[in-house]
């Protein structure tokens, strides 16, 4: 059986939008490029044709990948994540780190949605593993990294 892919509803919608774009815009454009390159004549030495075939293979692979992700998606209802008062996948968490004593905010998401530059942290990361299931005003140590540190959870949304 295939492994489930954990996604927020927003992440699922982004994948569906990407798939629609690939199917309705990108794939037809690549097919058009293939036809144009094919019309140039001799295919044995046609660099445009080779490039279009490579692009087609890339697009078809991405379409298949996105379809697989959508089909294996387990959507986390992040509207219910704060009802228990515990950190869960989909929670937005504010915390203070012992490294710099500054208030920071992250959202815990599935691994494929993770984007640390946007403060979207994978549920498989050391920080998420340490705080999932914890409540406000709990201090935890972030381990499994080269320099462990502590954080105190200030709010959960």
From Swiss-Prot:
Keywords: Coiled coil, DNA-binding, Transcription, Transcription regulation. Transmembrane segments: none annotated. Gene3D superfamilies: Transcription elongation factor, GreA/GreB, C-terminal domain, Transcription elongation factor, GreA/GreB, N-terminal domain. GO terms for biological process: DNA-templated transcription elongation; regulation of DNA-templated transcription elongation. GO terms for molecular function: DNA binding; RNA polymerase binding. Residues 1-75 form a coiled coil. Pfam families: GreA_GreB, GreA_GreB_N. It comes from the Bacteria. The keyword Hydrolase does not apply. Belongs to the GreA/GreB family. HAMAP family: GreA_GreB. Necessary for efficient RNA polymerase transcription elongation past template-encoded arresting sites. The arresting sites in DNA have the property of trapping a certain fraction of elongating RNA polymerases that pass through, resulting in locked ternary complexes. Cleavage of the nascent transcript by cleavage factors such as GreA or GreB allows the resumption of elongation from the new 3'terminus. GreA releases sequences of 2 to 3 nucleotides. PANTHER family: TRANSCRIPTION ELONGATION FACTOR GREA (PTHR30437:SF4). This is Transcription elongation factor GreA. It comes from Mycoplasma mycoides subsp. mycoides SC (strain CCUG 32753 / NCTC 10114 / PG1).
């Amino acid at each position: 059986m295939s492994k489930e892919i954990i996604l927020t509803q927003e992440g699922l919608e982004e994948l569906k939008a990407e798939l629609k774009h690939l199917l309705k815009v990108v794939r037809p454009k690549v097919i058009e490029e293939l036809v144009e390159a094919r019309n140039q004549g001799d295919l044995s030495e046609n660099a445009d044709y080779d490039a279009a075939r490579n692009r087609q293979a890339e697009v078809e692979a991405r379409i298949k990948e996105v379809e697989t992700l959508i089909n294996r998606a387990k959507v986390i209802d992040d509207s219910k994540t704060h009802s228990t008062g515990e950190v869960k996948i989909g929670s937005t968490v504010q915390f203070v780190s012992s490294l710099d004593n500054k208030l920071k905010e992250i959202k815990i998401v599935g691994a494929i949605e993770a984007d640390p530059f946007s403060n979207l942290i994978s549920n498989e990361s050391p920080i998420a593993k340490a705080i999932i299931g914890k409540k406000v005003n709990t201090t935890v140590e972030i381990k499994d990294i080269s320099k462990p540190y502590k954080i105190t959870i200030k709010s959960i949304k």
